[in-house]
Each structure stands twice: as C-alpha cells, then as structure tokens.
Amino acid sequence: MTDYTTYLGFRHLEKLYTASSLSFDCETTGLKPQVGGLRLLQFASAARKIVVVVDLFAASEEELAQLDLFFTNGDRFWLAHNAVFDLGWLQAYGWHPRGEVRCTMLASKILTNGMPNLKHGLAPVAKRYLGIDVSKEEQRSDWSGELTEAQIRYAAKDVEIL
C-alpha cells in the first residue's frame, strides 16, 4: 500500500474539494449522537494519495459551515466502512453527502453471505481482502481530550485503507 500524505486542519479540505471519489470516516466520543460527540472527520483520496483529518472540537462556526459545502459539492462517490454509523453521525450534525455512498462492511457481508464465524469490522476485512494488519488499539482511546500523534495516525490510516 502506498503511503498517503496526511494533513490536519480544515484549510486542507481544499485539496480534496474537486475529488470525484472520497473515503470518509468518523471518530466519536460515544456510539450515538445523543450521548457523545463527533470528534474527527477523515477524508481520503486514493487518486491524490491525500488524507485530510479535521478536528471538530477545535472548529469555528465558519469551518463547520465549510463542511456543509464540502459534503454537497458535486456528485461524489463516497466510501465508508460501517457507513450506517458514519452517516448517522453526519446527519445528526445536518450534513448529507451528495452522491453515492458505498459501505465496505456491507460489501463484506454480501460477499461472505452464509459463511459462518466471519467478522466484518475494518481490521478483519482489511486482513481478508488486502492482507493488511490493522491495529484498532487507538479506537478505544479517549477521543474527548487532547489528541495524540497516535490517535491522528490511527484516524488517518483507517480512512486510507478504504
């Protein structure tokens, strides 16, 4: 897998503004919007080998408005793992990606329909189809505090794999 360049901050969304296809992921402080917060949004372009990570806890109102324009600009192809989870969070914040959304978790379930004892989280799917080992150790870390380098690397890698 080719290494992507990772950028942190809203100003870097412009690097992806015209991309026709993007992977996206969310890092949250809870499993549901009613009991947690949306901490990070990560976007990746395979064509451009770029990942952009934005920290919503540090966002201004202007930057949040920028996200609405970003999600509705053009007619993109969006790819996520467990898209139902991610889209639920986006919709809770009033963001509705324009275009087609595809889910690698659902694709894995369809491809392995009827095969017992298979898991469909990102780590087992990446191992099964890409031969890549993915550490999910940071997934359970505290996303409500100051972000660590390890958390940012984890968030970027999750969306890069897609």
Protein language model features and the residues they cover:
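N-terminal accessory regions of nucleic-acid-interacting proteins
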Residues: 1-26, 34, 60-63
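N-terminal G-site helix/loop of the GST-like fold
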Residues: 18-20, 39-42
